[in-house]
């Protein structure tokens, strides 16, 4: 899904240590890195799935660091949409720590929505920092 705001430069994967698999429409990339002080930074496209491996430390930053997700080991994660009024991500399995800075949309005078879709639920986030796990 491509949105009016969503661009490849708006979603970055920071791989500090370990391995991740990035998959998009049949294309697979394997990334590994071992320097936590200088993370490997990879631009992600909307719809790309990220699967973290064992002993992996990785985070995803969106909207110029307004939305940060720290992925734990064995987590499958995907950014579905980045629209002007909402962000939707998907986490079928795994665990992650979310940190969301909810800025006011000046045109609509409301805060941008942040939704997390799991296998069993769609969660609308109202808080700013939380941990979520699913299996």
Predicted regions and their residues:
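Flexible, surface-exposed loop/linker segments and immediately adjacent secondary-structure boundaries
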Residues: 2-135
